[in-house]
C-alpha cells in the first residue's frame, strides 16, 4: 500500500531496512549497537553507495579508496552517483554503506570491501559528533521518482569502519541488494495495483460509443468504456499481473520467514535457497509486467492518461526505474540461469519443481481449481 501511495518516499524506509539487514548480518557488535537501534526507530536512514560514474553493473571497476588509519578506522575517498535517499533533512543522520578498495586489494570484484560511513560521525555513546566529509555534490534530474533525493556523493576523506571481512564487500552488500531486489518487485506491484484501481474506476465512469453486443446503459448517450473488449483486455491484464505478483511476493515472504525462523535447520536452508532462486524472478518478471500493466492502465484513460493532472503518467514514469536499478533485468536473467540454476546443476530448481508437483497432487482433485492446475500439470 505504501508503494501504491508513493514509491519515491517509500524508498527511504526501504533502504534503511536493507542497511539494517546488511549490518545485522555482517557488522561487528559495536556497529550493531551504534547503528541498528536508530535505523530501526527511523531516527536515522540508510543508503547503499555502489555506482560510480564509470561503473554500474561492473562493480569490479570501482575506484573509491579506503586508507587504513592507526585507530582501526578508514579514510574513504571517491565519488558515487545515483544514490537513492543520498541526502535529505528528514533524519538526524544518514548511514551510508559504501563499497571501496583497500590499498592491497586485488583487481576486480574480489578486491571490494564494504564500509559504514555516516553523514555525522557517531560517538561511542551513540551521540552524534562532527560532520563527516561525505557530501551531496549534485542531484540527478530523473524521469520519475521525483520524491526521492537521488544524489551524487563526493567522499573527501570521510571516516568509515569496515563491515565484514576485507575484500568480501560484495558478499556483505548482497544481503542488502537481495532485500532491495525483492523490494523493487514490491514497488512495481504497488504501482500496478494503484494504476489498475484508477483505470477500473475510470472505465466504469467514462462513456464512449455503444457496446458491440448492444446498448448497456440505456439512460445514457453512450456506454461505459469498460464494456469494450480492448478496454476489458487491458484491465484484466493489469489485474492478472497484480494478483500474480502479489501471490509470488507472499510466497517469497513466507519462505523468508522460514529461512529466518523455522526450527528445522534443513527447512531453513532449503527456504533460503528457494528465495535466492526466486529473487531475480521477482525483480525482473514483476517489474517487466508492471511496466506493461501501468502502460495499459494509462491507455485506458486515452488522451486523459497523457495529462499530468490525472496522475496515470506518473505511475508509468515511476515504474520505469524498477526495470533498471538494483541490477538491470537482463542481469537478473544472467543471475537466475548462471548462478541459481546452472551454479548447482539445477538442484534448487528441482526443489522448486517438487513444490509445484506437491501442489498439483494436492489440488488436482479439486474441480474448482482444475482450470488453474491443469496447465501447470502438463509443464
Which positions does each model-derived feature cover?
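Flexible, glycine/threonine-enriched loop-and-boundary segments that flank and lead into catalytic domains
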Residues: 47-88, 272-288, 292-309, 315
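Alpha-helix capping/hinge segments and adjacent helical runs
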Residues: 145, 251, 273-351
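Extended amphipathic alpha-helical segments enriched in small hydrophobics
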Residues: 181-259, 345-379
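C-terminal helix-coil-helix/basic helical segment that borders enzyme active sites and/or dimer interfaces
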Residues: 243-283
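Glycine- and acidic
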Residues: 1-7, 16-21, 47-49, 77-83, ...
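Internal helix-loop-helix
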Residues: 1-33, 37, 41-42, 85, ...
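A short core secondary-structure module
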Residues: 73, 77-131
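A glycine-rich, basic-preceded beta-loop-alpha segment at the flavin cofactor/substrate interface
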Residues: 82, 121-137, 142, 149-180, ...
Amino acid at each position: 500500500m505504501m508503494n501504491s501511495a508513493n514509491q519515491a518516499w517509500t524508498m527511504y524506509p526501504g533502504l534503511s531496512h536493507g542497511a539494517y539487514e546488511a549490518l545485522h548480518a555482517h557488522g561487528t557488535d559495536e556497529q550493531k549497537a551504534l547503528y541498528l537501534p536508530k535505523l530501526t526507530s527511523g531516527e536515522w536512514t540508510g543508503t547503499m553507495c555502489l555506482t560510480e560514474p564509470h561503473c554500474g553493473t561492473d562493480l569490479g571497476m570501482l575506484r573509491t579508496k579506503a586508507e587504513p588509519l592507526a585507530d582501526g578506522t578508514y579514510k574513504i575517498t571517491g565519488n558515487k552517483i545515483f544514490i537513492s535517499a543520498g541526502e535529505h533533512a528528514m533524519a538526524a543522520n544518514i548511514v551510508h554503506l559504501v563499497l571501496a578498495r583497500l590499498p592491497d586489494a586485488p583487481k576486480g570484484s574480489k578486491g571490494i570491501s564494504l564500509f559504514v560511513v555516516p553523514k555525522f560521525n557517531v560517538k561511542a555513546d551513540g551521540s552524534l559528533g562532527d560532520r563527516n566529509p561525505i557530501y551531496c555534490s549534485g542531484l540527478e534530474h530523473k524521469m520519475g521518482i521525483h520524491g526521492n533525493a537521488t544524489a551524487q556523493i563526493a567522499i573527501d576523506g570521510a571516516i568509515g569502519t569496515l563491515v565484514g571481512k576485507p575484500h568480501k564487500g560484495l558478499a556483505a552488500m548482497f544481503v542488502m541488494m537481495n532485500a532491495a531486489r525483492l523490494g523493487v518487485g514490491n514497488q512495481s506491484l504497488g504501482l500496478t495495483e494503484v494504476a489498475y484501481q484508477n483505470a477500473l474506476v475510470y472505465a466504469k465512469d467514462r462513456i464512449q460509443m455503444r457496446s458491440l453486443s448492444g446498448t448497456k446503459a440505456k439512460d445514457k448517450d453512450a456506454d461505459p468504456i469498460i464494456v469494450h473488449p480492448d478496454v476489458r483486455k487491458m484491465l484484466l491484464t493489469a489485474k492478472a499481473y497484480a494478483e500474480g505478483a502479489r501471490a509470488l511476493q507472499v510466497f517469497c515472504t513466507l519462505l523468508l520467514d522460514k529461512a529466518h525462523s523455522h526450527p528445522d535447520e534443513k527447512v531453513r536452508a532449503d527456504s533460503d535457497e528457494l528465495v535466492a532462486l526466486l529473487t531475480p524472478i521477482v525483480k525482473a518478471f514483476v517489474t517487466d509486467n508492471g511496466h506493461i500493466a501501468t502502460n495499459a492502465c494509462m491507455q485506458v484513460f486515452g488522451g486523459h492518461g497523457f495529462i499530468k493532472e490525472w496522475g496515470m503518467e506518473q505511475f508509468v514514469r515511476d515504474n520505469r526505474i524498477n526495470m533498471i536499478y538494483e541490477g538491470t533485468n537482463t542481469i537478473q536473467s544472467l543471475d537466475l540461469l548462471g548462478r541459481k540454476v546452472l551454479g548447482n546443476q539445477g538442484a534448487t530448481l528441482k526443489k522448486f519443481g517438487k513444490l509445484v508437483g506437491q501442489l498439483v497432487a494436492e489440488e488436482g482433485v479439486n474441480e474448482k481449481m482444475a482450470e488453474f492446475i491443469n496447465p501447470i500439470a502438463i509443464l
